[in-house]
Amino acid sequence: VREHFPEGLSAESLSRAPIIEFDRHDMFQQRFIGRITRVRIDPPRHFIPSSAEFAAAIELGMGWGMLPEAQSAEGIAAGRLAELTPSRSLKLPLYWQRWNLHSPVLDALSQIVEEEGKAALEA
């Protein structure tokens, strides 16, 4: 934050600061930029297609990116991560995908994953 956003967030600072993205389909950071600036910008980017390594790249200062609260809370508390907009957040829909098979075991597992995921994310 000190290096890339010393004057705060703006279209200019966001256009220069490197983004960490999961892959070429990851539009979460672009969605955040759009909400902040209302313009389309194309900053430099690094693709890190691993959840743990994605977070590590942000902690190492390779760039900025959006992390779930559960994944970022410890780093924020320890001072290794900083919130760019502490009073604002973005919600991202999550999907549980499975084979389209009739299976009581998969049906039960899907229900458990949905219930536990919802409880964990709304806590």
What spans do the regions from the language model cover?
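Secondary-structure junction motif
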Residues: 16-38
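Short secondary-structure boundary/capping segments
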Residues: 10-12, 36-38, 73, 86
